[in-house]
Amino acid sequence: RQATCPVLKSAMGNCYLYWSVNSSLEMVRSMIIDSHESEPDPVNAIEKVLIHRQALPSSLLVLWSSLKEKGFELKGDAELVAAFPQLQLVKDEEWGTPYLTKTVTFKLVDSLESAIAWINQYSSSHADSIVTESYQESRQFALGVNSASIYINTSPRFSRHSSRGETVFLGMSNQKGRRRGFISLETLTTVKHIIQGNGRF
């Protein structure tokens, strides 16, 4: 607020995942675990999971058991905690706050539209994910969620070094404009165009 020069704000944590009805339990499990293994910090860690109301209770129990074995702390909204007392009750202010620890909170939603609205209200808006078998759902999510990066059926895990080894990433920006998304050394520079002619047009 008191900066006298342009500021490029980076974001960390509080990334959301929407688990669509009838989509892969194993993919959800793998994406959550992998996202928390970012180096050196959990920049894109999935900390909040929105679950379609029609999800099978047995699938939830399998997921939670697996995450518990990996050392995760699990929380849920009031509806989930009432049905599954092993979950800790989430506080309202936590929906918009990053944990930056191995903590994941779960919430039931009625539809994809509800999930998109919730994510746009509470997410850090730099990396959000969806697991779905529907191309239409994936497109609706990608176009509807106001985040710098959208991950469809793939882990949002952050790595300082790109897979091609050409770029070093310093973080993720959720600011709107051309400096949104991955922050690299190139992001911190600008360009200058020099046009030379011989007087002919």
Give the positions of each predicted feature.
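ALDH superfamily catalytic-core signature
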Residues: 1-98
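Short, solvent-exposed amphipathic alpha-helical segments in soluble enzyme
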Residues: 2-5, 64-69, 120-124, 144-147, ...
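Residues at or immediately preceding the N-termini of alpha-helices
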Residues: 25, 111-112, 135
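Flexible, glycine/charged-enriched surface loops at secondary-structure junctions
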Residues: 40-46, 73-79, 127-133, 151-155, ...
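Short, well-ordered beta-strand elements within core beta-sheets of diverse protein domains
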Residues: 50-51, 101-110, 125-130
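Conserved glycine-rich beta-strand-loop-beta hairpin in the small C-terminal domain of fold type I
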Residues: 96-103, 122-126, 148-149
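C-terminal segments
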Residues: 133-201
